[in-house]
Design a protein with these regions (language model features):
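Compositionally biased intrinsically disordered regions enriched in Thr/Gly
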Residues: 7-259
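Short, Lys/Arg-rich N-terminal segment immediately upstream of the first membrane anchor
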Residues: 1-6
């Protein structure tokens, strides 16, 4: 048999293997189904200045490895959002138990200090982006549990579609240094168009540590979204700061990009 024929057969086999593998992945991912879970709670027999909790999160249907890991992570995140006033994170408490604890704590405080303003928690989750290897979920959150100001935040979570494991920031990109350099440019552009003051020699508002990526980073179709909590930039900041980096510039370094 000629070498060219063997080579062609090898290429054909490789192509068929990729097609079969791709079709199998498509069938698996197309079977993933999500449902929205909505929970609304308020203080019983309350007419004015009432505690309010609004939760909208996703649950993956079925019993696949992805569904089990995804649902466990979401359960943990929502429960800890409800228990955000506690000192330590919980990993084995249900959302219902956490909700009962939150409302009970508020009712106990309100009983002794009826003049306190009503607490309010809002959480809304949605899938922001997905390819054949991963998906990004965004959780928009609002929390007022006393104090001077309410807290608004975004939490992005990335899931590997083959098993539902969380993709950490450290594993999100193949070259974090290059992504950081690209992000730094867009941070500066966004900063110059905002009211953030210049604090250090590089022209950024970081407290002596230099520019760095935030803890919360989200992927959308068009942008890598960098969501900086106030304390991540400077101690004097009282509001979050969002930077959008064109996805086309960082896509080459995405660990879970399409083949």
């Amino acid at each position: 048999m000629k070498k060219s024929s063997v080579k062609k057969r090898g290429i054909l086999c490789s192509v068929l293997s990729l097609l079969i593998s791709g079709y199998s992945l498509y069938r698996y991912f197309s079977k993933l189904r999500f449902e929205e879970v909505a929970i609304e709670r308020s203080t019983d027999n309350c007419e004015d200045n009432c505690l309010s909790v609004s939760l909208n999160y996703l649950r993956c249907k079925g019993n696949s490895e992805f569904a089990q890991n995804f649902n466990k992570e979401i359960e943990t995140q929502v429960a800890n959002f409800l228990l955000s006033n506690e000192d330590t994170l919980q990993v084995d408490v249900s959302i219902e138990k956490a909700l009962e604890s939150f409302m009970s704590d508020y009712n106990n405080i309100h009983e002794h200090f009826p003049e306190i303003p009503a607490y309010e928690l809002i959480l809304s989750d949605s899938i922001m982006w997905q390819n054949s290897k991963m998906l990004t979920l965004v959780s928009n959150r609002y929390s007022f549990t006393g104090g001077a100001n309410a807290v608004q935040s975004k939490v992005f979570t990335h899931f590997a579609l083959d098993n539902g494991e969380v993709i950490t920031n450290e594993n999100l990109f193949t070259d974090e240094a290059k992504v950081t350099a690209i992000a730094e440019k867009y941070f500066k552009q966004t900063q110059e168009a905002s009211v953030i003051e210049v604090l250090d020699d590089k022209g950024f508002g970081f407290d002596g540590n230099g520019f760095h990526l935030p803890k919360s980073m989200g992927i959308s179709a068009d942008y890598l979204i960098l969501f900086y909590e106030p304390f991540e930039i400077a101690s004097y900041m009282d509001a979050a700061f969002e930077v959008k980096v064109p996805m086309k510039e960082v896509m080459p370094y995405l660990t879970f990009k399409e083949d």
